[in-house]
Amino acid sequence: HTTVMKKYILHTLIAVLIGFSANAQIDRSQIPSSGPTPEVNLRDAKEFKLKNGLTVLVATDTKFPVVSWSLNLNNPPVFEGNKAGVQSLTGALLGKETLKSTKDEFAEKVDFLGASVSVNPNGGFGYCLTKYQEDVFSLFAEAAFKTKFTQEELDFEKEQLIEGIKSGENSAAAIAGNVRGAVFYGKNHAAGEIVTEETINNVSLEDVKQFYTDRFKPSNGFMLFTGDITVKEVKKLLKKYMKGWKSGSVTIPEYPSFEDVSTTEINFVDVPNAVQ
C-alpha cells in the first residue's frame, strides 16, 4: 500500500509540475495565432437551376440515412417604417397553420415523423430520415406556399412581440441594441429602425400577406440539399411540390448614405424608471 501511495503522490506532483510549466510558457500579453482556415469542400455537389431562377445544389452523402435542405432567398434588408415589426410577424405566422392543417395538426405531423421543418420570409430548412423525405418535404412546401394567415394568430403574435418589447424596456442590453443600430445607420435604415408597440399595432393582416408575397420569391435564391439523397430524387421533389412557384426577385432598396463619425461619441439614453 505504501508503494502504491508513493507512486500516486509522485504522479500527482509530475502532473502539477507539467501544468505549471505549460502555464509558464503561455504569454497572455500576445494574441495567439489563428489556426488554418477550414476548407468547405463542395466539389462533389451537383448544381442546376430551375426555370424560376432558383439555384439548387445537391451534396450527396450516404454515410447516414438522413437528409436536410436549406432555402436561402438572399433577400436584402427592408426598411419597414411605421410598420416596423411586419417581418417578425410574418415569420411568426409562416408555416404555423396551413390551408390543409390547423397549427396543432401540422406540428403533430412533423413530430410524428421525427423531423424538423421551419419557414420564414427569407427561406427555411428541413431535416428528416431519408425514408420520410417525401412526406417531410411535402410538409415543408405546405408551410412555404399554403400558410393560412389568420387575424386570431396575428393578434396572438402581436401580443407576444409587445410583451417582449416591454420586458426589455429596463434591459441595458436591449436599450443598447436599439441605440447602436440607430446611431450607426440612422433611424431611416433597415438596420437602424426600432420596433415599438405603436409600429406593431400599425401592422394589419393584409400587410403580413403582402410582405410575404413581395419577399418570398425564388430568382435570387438558392437551395442546398445534403445527405442521403440523389439529384434525381431532388428534381422529383421539386417538380412535384414547387412547380407552381413562379419566378420573381426582390428589389434592392436605396438607403440614404451615412458617414463614420470623425470623433469618439458617447451616447446617453434617459431611462426615468431605472433603479439606478
Question: Could you tell me what each predicted segment is?
Answer:
Residues 2-12:
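Bacterial N-terminal signal peptides that target proteins for export
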Residues 25-33, 193, 222-276:
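An aromatic/glycine/proline-enriched structural segment found at the starts
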Residues 38-67:
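Mature N-terminal segment immediately following signal peptide/propeptide cleavage
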Residues 51, 55, 61-63, 72-76, ...:
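Solvent-exposed coil/turn segments that connect beta secondary-structure elements
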